[in-house]
Amino acid sequence: MGISRDNWHKRRKTGGKRKPYHKKRKYELGRPAANTKIGPRRIHTVRVRGGNKKYRALRLDVGNFSWGSECCTRKTRIIDVVYNASNNELVRTKTLVKNCIVLIDSTPYRQWYESHYALPLGRKKGAKLTPEEEEILNKKRSKKIQKKYDERKKNAKISSLLEEQFQQGKLLACIASRPGQCGRADGYVLEGKELEFYLRKIKARKGK
């Protein structure tokens, strides 16, 4: 029997049975879940009603994540699934779905921050810089450009929770797209109250 999204196979509100008065219809069909995993990109196309296409992502390893407070969006690697409000099984099997909390690689955001503000981010005290990083952070600039960077530095403060994550090289992010429908795992970096909330949840889960 196929997966069906009808309601006439359920009992009535009064508890009585319903007699099926027609067979299953094409418009009542359902399809098996995509259960998108982390791995080299594998996407199937599905022909749907109206001749349209859906992109069923079976495996994904990168996504486009937006750092809201800094208006910076970068393509980055998805490392792990750490929390899912709807189902712990999806965390255990590392399944990518909408609104699951994942760890992403922080390198693209750190590179952007350091070139935009000319300030180090998430560096250990006294850590050696590579010549390229040295060039970006300690470059000789004209007075006019230096003034522009000094203006930017006034707003360069980021929260201590984010800074800790940058030191570990991984950021917590939330997936906002639907990988099994559009074939992408895009989302946003967690910040502020939302980040505090999910850190508490993850800690409570680990403590069990």
Swiss-Prot record:
N6-acetyllysine occurs at 37, 128
This protein's GO CC annotations: cytoplasm; cytosol; cytosolic ribosome; cytosolic small ribosomal subunit; endoplasmic reticulum; extracellular exosome; focal adhesion; membrane
Membrane topology term? Lipid-anchor
From start to end residue, where is composition biased (Basic residues)?
A: 8-26
Subcellular localization, per the record?
Cytoplasm; Membrane; Nucleus, Nucleolus
**Which keywords does UniProt give here?**
Acetylation, Cytoplasm, Isopeptide bond, Lipoprotein, Membrane, Myristate, Nucleus, Phosphoprotein, Ribonucleoprotein, Ribosomal protein, Ubl conjugation
Cross-link Glycyl lysine isopeptide (Lys-Gly) (interchain with G-Cter in SUMO2) position reads 170, 193
Please give the superkingdom of this protein's source: Eukaryota
Q: Where is this region: Disordered?
A: 1-27
State if Translocase is listed as a keyword. Answer: no
Q: Which GO terms describe its molecular function?
A: RNA binding; structural constituent of ribosome
GO BP annotations of the record are: cytoplasmic translation; maturation of SSU-rRNA from tricistronic rRNA transcript (SSU-rRNA, 5.8S rRNA, LSU-rRNA); ribosomal small subunit biogenesis; translation
Please list the residues that carry the modification Phosphoserine: 160
Q: Which InterPro entries match?
A: Ribosomal_eS8, Ribosomal_eS8_CS, Ribosomal_protein_eS8_euk, Ribosomal_Se8/biogenesis_NSA2
Presence of the UniProt keyword Nucleus in the record: yes
Lipid-modified sites (N-myristoyl glycine): 2
Q: Which residues carry this modification: Phosphothreonine?
A: 130
By its UniProt entry, which NCBIfam families does this protein fall under? Answer: eS8
Q: Which PANTHER family match?
A: 40S RIBOSOMAL PROTEIN S8
Similarity comment: Belongs to the eukaryotic ribosomal protein eS8 family.
User: Subunit arrangement?
Assistant: Component of the small ribosomal subunit. Identified in a IGF2BP1-dependent mRNP granule complex containing untranslated mRNAs. Part of the small subunit (SSU) processome, composed of more than 70 proteins and the RNA chaperone small nucleolar RNA (snoRNA) U3.
Q: What does this protein do?
A: Component of the small ribosomal subunit. The ribosome is a large ribonucleoprotein complex responsible for the synthesis of proteins in the cell. Part of the small subunit (SSU) processome, first precursor of the small eukaryotic ribosomal subunit. During the assembly of the SSU processome in the nucleolus, many ribosome biogenesis factors, an RNA chaperone and ribosomal proteins associate with the nascent pre-rRNA and work in concert to generate RNA folding, modifications, rearrangements and cleavage as well as targeted degradation of pre-ribosomal RNA by the RNA exosome.
UniProt-recorded name of the protein: Small ribosomal subunit protein eS8
